[in-house]
Amino acid sequence: MIELDGVAKTFDGGVSALQDVSFSVPTGSICALLGHNGAGKTTTIGILSTLLMPTAGRAVVAGHDVVREPDRVRASIGVTGQDASVDIMLTGRENLVLFGRLRGLRRKQARIRADELIEQFDMTHAADRTVLTYSGGMRRRIDIAASLVVPPAVLFLDEPTTGLDPRSRRDVWALVSSLSAQDVTVLLTTQYLEEADVLSDSVVILNAGRVVADGTAEELKSRTGFVYCQVSPVDPADLSGIAAALADFRGLEVDRDMNTVSVPADRGVATLGEVFRRLDDRNIDLTDIALRRPSLDEVFLHLTEPPVTA
């Protein structure tokens, strides 16, 4: 379990990175920590992994206070950063054995554990090749596997799929999802909103060092409160006609790439009926008309402000 209560962090020079951050992650669940660059995600991970000291507040990881019991916290966690921590000149197997030895396993235990992880992570075919020859997806696999050599109670994943192709990203998703079945608590930061939607049991959104939303992805979508009516014409040439017919709707959006027109549906089904009537009067044929809730991407944009640039 992870708990933060009123955590703040101010760096030298008075730069405030976190302000009154509070949230919790139950044992065996996956929480996605979202925010723009500079929102405080990496600082939060740094505090929870004892790399940084909080200026105020309390943080508990796996039952241990990060300030009073840092050694116990470190013994309970695994951390995978944005850059791979493995030695690219060693084989995958050699890396896992090395990490096992560094974590206190005897040589035989380290070899046995390495073999278990190689099989679990489907790396048998590449285990005895140097990591230098691995694809980006394979490097992320071996990196995550290394953080699990001694099974942690809590695993921190800092943007685990950045730079990966879609197939490799989904492979990593499958690996991360399997961890909750092993009662591992996972806190991950990510720039990919789809990733958070697919993987997470809960989502925490940071903006300028503060928590602006905390809940499941579905709860956040519902809490945002807006629903829109989206239509798709049979003939893309009708997009302009649809826009003209619905011109009095505030917030109308035309997406020519997706062949859709969307308007806010403040009255729900009544709005959908009004849209359908207007387009029917103009003899515009549709392939689809529906009420839709916002995506997690739209929720994120709604709740956060762009970072201030100099």
Predicted features along the sequence, with ranges:
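Non-catalytic surface loops within mature trypsin-like serine protease
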Residues: 13, 27, 125, 235-236, ...
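C-terminal coupling/interaction segments
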Residues: 267-310
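ABC transporter nucleotide-binding domains
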Residues: 2-4, 9-207, 212-213
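Conserved NTP-handling cores and scaffolds of large molecular machines
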Residues: 103, 224, 228, 250, ...
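ABC transporter nucleotide-binding domain
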Residues: 173-266
